[in-house]
Regions:
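Long, charged low-complexity intrinsically disordered regions
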Residues: 1-165
Length: 165
């Protein structure tokens, strides 16, 4: 599954960047304005340092809004407001359930999933070879960060049976 494979590759790269505090970011030409509720404001304030370490640069902009000025390069092709909203929602949902390390893992998984190539997207031969090579350089090429299989074994018997033999 090309989406799961790319997600695994991105996840391991981003997690390594996070551990080394080297997440690449891109400044936004037009900062994204986000209106927040009181609960969202509290969760942003609580996890402000974590958001910065993940490459999400956010600044207070009035009493109930923030502006996002930088995002991880990983997310450059995604709508900033949508992804930041999803991250805030994930923080609200998991803040009390997850330990800090698990919360970081969850957010890196979310960002990797959103940035990964989509299932069914056409890849030329060079892209396929590159993706497979990157996948086999990961620590866990069998499963995506969500736990879904990337590679499955299909025996000759399974193929023959599906062909009515």
């Amino acid at each position: 599954d090309q989406h799961n494979a790319h997600e695994r590759v991105l996840y391991e790269k981003k997690y390594a960047e996070y551990r080394q505090q080297e997440i690449l970011t891109q400044g936004l030409l037009v900062p994204v304005n986000i209106e927040v509720t009181l609960a969202e404001k509290k969760i942003i304030e609580k996890h402000f340092d974590l958001l910065n370490k993940l490459g999400i640069k956010i600044e207070s902009f009035g009493s109930n809004s923030y502006i996002v000025t930088e995002l991880p390069l990983l997310l450059k092709n995604l709508p900033g407001q949508v992804i930041v909203r999803e991250i805030i929602d994930r923080l609200l949902e998991n803040d009390r359930k997850l330990q800090p390390a698990d919360l970081i893992d969850d957010l890196i998984t979310l960002m990797s999933c959103k940035a990964a190539i989509k299932a069914g997207k056409y890849l030329d031969m060079r892209e396929m070879i590159e993706l497979v090579a990157e996948l086999f350089n990961t620590e866990n090429p069998e499963r995506c960060p969500h736990g879904r299989p990337i590679i499955i074994h299909i025996s000759n018997e399974d193929i023959a049976r599906s062909m009515g033999r």
